[in-house]
C-alpha cells in the first residue's frame, strides 16, 4: 500500500553538466607541461610537514587511488611523482563564470550546484531546440572550443537521473536515460552510486541485503519508511526513477562575497588595500552577473593568530559600484584597531541583496 501516490513527470528535459576534474584540468590547460602527468590540487606535503588535503586531482593521479579529501601525505606516498599545485581559486571561479555564461545561451533555468556542475532545464529553451541531447552536445562543444575544457553530460526527464547519467561515462561522456530505460538503468547500479544516498544509509541498506537498484525496487515502501523515516519515501521513488524536484534557477542569494587566504602574510597597508580592491571588484562583477544590488558591505579580516574580525556598514542606497564597495571596505579596515599580527585572510561581502532596478546607476 502506497503512503503517497506515485506522480512521475516525464515531460521535462533536464541536463546535468559536470566538468571533468575541473581544477586540475584548468591547470593542465594553462601549463601544457602537465599533460599526461599526475596532478594533485593541494599543498605539497614535503613543504608543509605532511599537512594538507587533496582538493581534487586529474584522471592520471586517480589511477594511483588518489581522490578528493585524501591527505596530501597519503597522496604523495601513493604517487611520489605527482605534481602538487596549491591552486588558484580566483582563476577557477572566473572560468566557472565563463562556463555559466555558455549555459545561459540556451536557458535561463540553470541551477549551479558548485563551481563545476549545474542542472539545466531545457524543456522550453531559448533556441527552440527540441532535442536535449543536441543541446548537451552543443554545450560540450562550446565549452571545449571557448574554454578549452571537457565536461560530461547526463540527459533525462529529472534531476536525479540526469545526475546519475553524467557520472556514467567520464570524462567527456554523454549519457541519455529515457523514461522507458530508467528502471533498467537503475537496476544495474550499485546502491552507493545513487545520488543523495550517504555512507551511513548505504551501510544500513547493505545490512538489509540491498546492494543494487534492483534490490531496492523489490522493497515495499512501508518497510523503507520503517527503517529510514521520511528518507524511505524518497528511496522508494528513487528506485523507480521518480523525482519531481524542479531546477531552481531562482534560488534566493542572501549574500555575494569574495575572500582569499594568503600563504604569505600581509603586513603593509598598500598590500592590504590592494587585496581589498581585488575582492571589491570581484564582488561587483558577481553582483553584475547575478543581476543583484546590495546595501550592506561586510569586511572580514583574519590575523596570523586566527583572530577574526567582521564589521559591516549599511549604505543608504542600493549599489554594485566597484569603487564604492572598495571605498567602504577600505574605510572599514581603517576603523579597525591596529593589530601587529600579519593578515592571513581578507574578505569582502555584500548582503541585503535585491534584484536589479532599472533606474539605478550601475556604472562599475
From Swiss-Prot:
Predominant location: cytoplasm
Listed NCBIfam families: PRK02406.1
Necessary cofactors: Mg(2+)
Phylogenetic lineage: Bacteria, Bacillati, Bacillota, Bacilli, Lactobacillales
Record-level GO cellular component terms: cytosol
Gene: dinB
EC identifiers of the protein: 2.7.7.7
Natural source organism: Streptococcus pyogenes serotype M12 (strain MGAS2096)
Keyword Cell cycle: no
Disulfide bond annotation, renumbered to this chain: none
Family, per entry: Belongs to the DNA polymerase type-Y family.
GO molecular function: damaged DNA binding; DNA-directed DNA polymerase activity; magnesium ion binding
Protein name stated in the entry: DNA polymerase IV
Amino acid at each position: 500500500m502506497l503512503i503517497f501516490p506515485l506522480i512521475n513527470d516525464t515531460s521535462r528535459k533536464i541536463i546535468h553538466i559536470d566538468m571533468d576534474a575541473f581544477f586540475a584540468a584548468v591547470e593542465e590547460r594553462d601549463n601544457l607541461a602537465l599533460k599526461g602527468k599526475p596532478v594533485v590540487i593541494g599543498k605539497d606535503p614535503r613543504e608543509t610537514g605532511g599537512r594538507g588535503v587533496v582538493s581534487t586531482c586529474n584522471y592520471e593521479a586517480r589511477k594511483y587511488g588518489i581522490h578528493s579529501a585524501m591527505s596530501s601525505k597519503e597522496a604523495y606516498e601513493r604517487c611520489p611523482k605527482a605534481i602538487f599545485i596549491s591552486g588558484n581559486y580566483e582563476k577557477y571561479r572566473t572560468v566557472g563564470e565563463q562556463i555559466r555564461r555558455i549555459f545561459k545561451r540556451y536557458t535561463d533555468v540553470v541551477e549551479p550546484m558548485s563551481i563545476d556542475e549545474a542542472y539545466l532545464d531545457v524543456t522550453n529553451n531559448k533556441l527552440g531546440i527540441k532535442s536535449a541531447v543536441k543541446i548537451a552536445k552543443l554545450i560540450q562543444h562550446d565549452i571545449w572550443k571557448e574554454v578549452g575544457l571537457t565536461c560530461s553530460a547526463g540527459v533525462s526527464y529529472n534531476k536525479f537521473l540526469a545526475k546519475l547519467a553524467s557520472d556514467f561515462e567520464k570524462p567527456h561522456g554523454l549519457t541519455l536515460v529515457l523514461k522507458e530505460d530508467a528502471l533498467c538503468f537503475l537496476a544495474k547500479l550499485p546502491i552507493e552510486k545513487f545520488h543523495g544516498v550517504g555512507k551511513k544509509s548505504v551501510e544500513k541498506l547493505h545490512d538489509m541485503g540491498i546492494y543494487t537498484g534492483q534490490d531496492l525496487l523489490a522493497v515495499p515502501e512501508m518497510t523503507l519508511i520503517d527503517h529510514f523515516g521520511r528518507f524511505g519515501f524518497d528511496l522508494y521513488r528513487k528506485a523507480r526513477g521518480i523525482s519531481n524536484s524542479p531546477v531552481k534557477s531562482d534560488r534566493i542569494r542572501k549574500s555575494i562575497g569574495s575572500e582569499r587566504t594568503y600563504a604569505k602574510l600581509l603586513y603593509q597597508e598598500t598590500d592590504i588595500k590592494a587585496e581589498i580592491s581585488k575582492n571589491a571588484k570581484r564582488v561587483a562583477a558577481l553582483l553584475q552577473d547575478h543581476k543583484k544590488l546590495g546595501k550592506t558591505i561586510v569586511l572580514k579580516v583574519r590575523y596570523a593568530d586566527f583572530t577574526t574580525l567582521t564589521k559591516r556598514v549599511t549604505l543608504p542606497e542600493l549599489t554594485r559600484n566597484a569603487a564604492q564597495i572598495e571605498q567602504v571596505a577600505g574605510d572599514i579596515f581603517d576603523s579597525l584597531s591596529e593589530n601587529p599580527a600579519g593578515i592571513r585572510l581578507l574578505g569582502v561581502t555584500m548582503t541585503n541583496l535585491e534584484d536589479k532596478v532599472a533606474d539605478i546607476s550601475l556604472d562599475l
